[in-house]
């Protein structure tokens, strides 16, 4: 049980930002990552569709890889599916919204926080509710940025056009008094440098990856599930879409070749 992998799922490549942080904080753990790049983005999809897709990814990992913990490294899927999946499976399941909210609360000085995310994440008010539950005196600015996920998935995030698309997407927040900005989509940290340049050094840019990895570590430790094996960890990367495109983005993000990327098909009927 201890050597069973942690499953990390996302609509595409964005959850790699969370997986990378889990690998850094928990270097002995085996990680299996599934990016549903064929059906990305989840942001504009109907909620029932997002729920079904998230369950398909979850069931695939439970049945084929016997994961000991699941990380829903997608804000849209967290907002829509986390509660349902937590109630239904027999392993620990964490999302990325609560950790992101906690991280922002720690660093804001003026209690004015911005949140950017997909249409579904923003529409759900999940971040605003999480933030106000922690501090009801906060002022929260929400902004949907639907252009950013397709841009990251295209693999062009190292291009100079990143600054232009960030400016186009974030300009409504530019003249606000926010001192902290939550990247409410796990794709967005890949554009963190461009976002920081546009918003200015006075704005704290919050990615949920670090806090999510810390929560994973805490839960595994509490439940006695930390991997103690001296054997080097085995990390697997799976995608439902174009394997070469996924591998290129993963290699760029990790700064080295991640190894073999497997293309999978999710044809099994939903099981809940």
From Swiss-Prot:
Substrate binds at residues 10-11, 42-43, 75-76, 186-187. Signal peptide: none annotated. Keywords: Cell shape, Cell wall biogenesis/degradation, Isomerase, Peptidoglycan synthesis. The active site is at 74 (proton donor/acceptor), 185 (proton donor/acceptor). Gene3D superfamilies: 3.40.50.1860. The keyword Ubl conjugation does not apply. GO terms for biological process: cell wall organization; peptidoglycan biosynthetic process; regulation of cell shape. One of its GO terms (molecular function) is glutamate racemase activity. Pathway: Cell wall biogenesis; peptidoglycan biosynthesis. Its EC number is 5.1.1.3. It catalyses: L-glutamate = D-glutamate. HAMAP family: Glu_racemase. Provides the (R)-glutamate required for cell wall biosynthesis. Belongs to the aspartate/glutamate racemases family. NCBIfam families: glut_race (TIGR00067), PRK00865.1-3 (NF002035). This is Glutamate racemase 1. The lineage of its organism: Bacteria, Bacillati, Bacillota, Bacilli, Bacillales.
